């Protein structure tokens, strides 16, 4: 193999490696970040691999939430307008016996797979029950 062909092969291999590195997904924010709307949170949950084909919005929203909704009986999503309202919801969730709640900067999700959500959305998992 001549030097030109060898150099071209090395360049192609280097470009391939660079493309792989550039396509890696950035980790989610440690604090879970914020979502501008319940629809944006819903899309993030879907992108994490949890099926929620039909988000049913609560009218009016849950007590402390700016917006809230559910997907069936095992998934509940909510966004909050302030830290105070978010904290009030977490305090209530502790007494209501929720097993685990995913918590971000302005959102919560109750689901059957809190660790998957934490891995994809960031934030923390608050364990409140058995």
Identify the meaning behind each predicted range.
Residues 26-36:
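Terminal, regulation- and interaction-focused segments at domain boundaries
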Residues 72-130:
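Extracytosolic low-complexity repeat regions of secreted or lipid-anchored proteins
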Residues 21-24:
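Bacterial signal peptide processing site
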């Amino acid at each position: 193999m001549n030097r030109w062909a060898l150099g071209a092969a090395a360049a192609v291999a280097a470009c391939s490696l660079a493309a792989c590195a550039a396509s890696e997904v950035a980790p989610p924010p440690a604090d879970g970040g914020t979502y501008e709307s319940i629809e944006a949170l819903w899309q993030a949950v879907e992108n994490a691999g949890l099926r929620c084909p039909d988000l049913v919005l609560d009218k009016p929203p849950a007590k402390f939430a700016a917006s809230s909704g559910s997907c069936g009986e095992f998934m509940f999503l909510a966004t909050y307008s302030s830290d105070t309202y978010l904290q009030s919801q977490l305090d209530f969730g502790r007494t209501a016996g929720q097993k685990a709640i995913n918590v971000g900067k302005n959102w919560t999700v109750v689901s059957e797979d809190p660790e998957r959500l934490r891995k994809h959305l960031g934030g923390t998992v608050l364990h409140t029950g058995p």
